[in-house]
Amino acid sequence: MNKFWNWTKDLMTNTPELVLEGEIASETWWGDEITPKLFKDELNKHKGKDISVWINSPGGDVIAGSQIYTMLKEHTGKVNVKIDGLAASSASFIAMAGDTIQMSPTAMMMIHLPSTFDWGDKKDFQKTIARLEEIEKAIINAYELKTKLPRDELSKLMEDETWMNAYRAKELGFIDEVLYTNEEEKSQTGFDFSKKKVNACMQNSINQIPVSYTHLRAHETR
């Protein structure tokens, strides 16, 4: 079994963190009862708790991706997804399970059509094509729920093998926030607040000038 996930904890907030790193299941979860159960059992240890899910993955098995997506959607606490490197292929629709989805300004997301290897006669290939078309529709379901984009537009993005930086992903609705951008806003807010205090102090000093001057003139005329 290739365990592509592990659990850590944010030392500042004590929030459980699920880290998805590398290929999502090098072997398919189709017919595998052990690996999905292990993943679910570990997730259930944090039942009712808010969790963060860090993703850096090129994707992998669609069945595994589907099960992980569903387990995260079923989680009773809030799920905050953070993409720090790459969320491609099946990892991209796993990310859609987040109640909130954040992305590093240096990270990338990629969506494309499902693919497979097959052999046989023309009927076998026709069945494979039909199966891939249904898988595409299933993946679009996850994208559509998050982005609210039309299905034909999502299908076109997949056909084009679309790569998105964080700002493009936010523009299209795949994520909610680009990480660390609020720090600049907070800094600017702090600066504005300080500037207001300085201006207020200066104005107060100016307002005191006529009073002092009047007092001085009155003293001089005595």
Regions inferred by a protein language model and the residue ranges of each:
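N-terminal organellar transit peptides
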Residues: 1-90, 98-217, 222
